[in-house]
């Protein structure tokens, strides 16, 4: 896959596959606070998906290709997402630029003068 970069100065629509984990939910919340339109899915509900949903973020429980029917500019996925995941396959079919959680985290960290690993 080619390298995908998000322009953090231009909020857009980002979909998170696996949004219910501690790391992905935190990244989703950061982008949401920066004015991005955030949505995502997870295999099961969690305190994190409930918290994001309470903020008005669209959360899908279950990962189905139909979840990507609304316009999305970027997809972020976790290492837990397999290449045969229906959403992963649909994002590729639609040509949506995709980046891993680690790639997004690295890009975000470059926006700050100091960071803690």
Where are these regions (language model features)?
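Hydrophobic alpha-helical hairpins/lids featuring a short glycine-rich hinge
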Residues: 115-117
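N-terminal leader/targeting and accessory segments in enzymes
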Residues: 1-104
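Phosphate-binding P-loop
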Residues: 107-113
């Amino acid at each position: 896959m080619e390298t995908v970069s998000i322009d953090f100065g231009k909020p857009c629509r980002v979909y998170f596959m696996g949004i219910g984990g501690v790391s992905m939910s935190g990244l989703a919340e950061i982008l949401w606070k920066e004015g991005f339109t955030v949505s995502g899915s997870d295999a099961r509900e969690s305190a994190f998906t409930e918290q994001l949903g309470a903020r008005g973020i669209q959360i899908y429980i279950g990962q189905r290709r139909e979840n990507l029917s609304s316009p999305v500019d970027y997809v972020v996925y976790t290492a837990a997402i397999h290449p045969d995941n229906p959403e992963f396959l649909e994002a590729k079919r639609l040509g949506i630029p995709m980046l891993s959680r680690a790639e997004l985290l690295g890009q975000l960290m470059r926006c700050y003068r100091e960071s803690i690993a």
